[in-house]
């Protein structure tokens, strides 16, 4: 299972239903507004990376979204590869 956290900025006059639009996207498991350098975060989950990319693009092109940064969560398989690697 692939997972990502999408951080984003909204246009100054963003629609009040933007979070509802995010939450209606299949694969979005959480979304909320933030204070700080980003205006919102979305947590998304999908079986394949390509589906996760599709979710990120849907969020990026939602009306009122000015920019996004997608952070892929390191899954257990990748973490095990990192742990097994010897850094010489």
Regions from the PLM with identified roles:
Residues 1-88:
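A compositional/biophysical signature of low hydrophobicity enriched in polar/charged and small residues
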């Amino acid at each position: 299972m692939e997972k990502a956290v999408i951080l984003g900025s909204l246009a100054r006059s963003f629609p009040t239903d933007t979070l509802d639009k995010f939450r209606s996207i299949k694969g979005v498991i959480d979304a909320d507004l933030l204070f700080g350098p980003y205006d919102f975060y979305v947590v998304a989950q999908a079986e394949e990376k390509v589906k996760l990319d599709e979710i990120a693009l849907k969020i990026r092109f939602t009306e009122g979204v000015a920019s996004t940064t997608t952070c892929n969560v390191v899954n257990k398989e990748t973490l095990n590869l990192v742990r097994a690697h010897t850094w010489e």
